Amino acid sequence: MRPGLICGAALALCAAFMAAPAYCADGQKAVEERNKQIAIEFYNAALNEKNWEKTRSMIGNRYVQHNLGAIDGPEGLKAHIEYLKKEFPNNHGEIKHALADGDLVALHVHNQRSPELRGNAVVDLFRIENGKVVEHWDVVQAIPEPEKAKNKNTMF
């Protein structure tokens, strides 16, 4: 084999190895961006539109619920949507931030059961698998009256 051919092949191989991390990072970023969009669309369909048919198409055959006050599985989610539709038809969550880390997406939300209420600061965490929402965690904190706050910062 000729030395020039060997050097050329070695350089091409080195270039491929050097480009691989950038390609993988770009691919991972694209997956995370898609996962964010899935979580946002899911949140809006389930909690803002309260549309079970649309929501059902966005979840997997299993839906693991980590909120201990909510029923596990797709039927539990359906019951929660029906409850919101009946008891809190004006319930609305404004997504303030969306962050993705691999298959996990966190949404920082200002949720109000009705427009005249201060509402809650919520962080919803969703796990996305094969383009479907399959798992959910949340943390909810009531927004205090301004005069009871210990600082002037907002929760959002």
Spans of model-derived segments:
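Bacterial N-terminal signal peptides that target proteins for export
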Residues: 1-9
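Bacterial N-terminal signal peptides
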Residues: 8-18
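Short, low-complexity N-terminal intrinsically disordered segments enriched in polar/charged residues
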Residues: 19-53, 57, 150-156
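A solvent-exposed, acidic/Ser-Thr-rich amphipathic alpha-helical stretch
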Residues: 52-101
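Short, solvent-exposed coil/turn segments at beta-strand boundaries
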Residues: 55, 59, 100-104, 126-134
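Short, surface-exposed coil-to-beta transition loops
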Residues: 91-93, 117-123
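Short beta-strand segments that buttress and anchor functional surface loops
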Residues: 107-114
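Short beta-strand edge/turn micro-motifs at domain boundaries
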Residues: 123-151
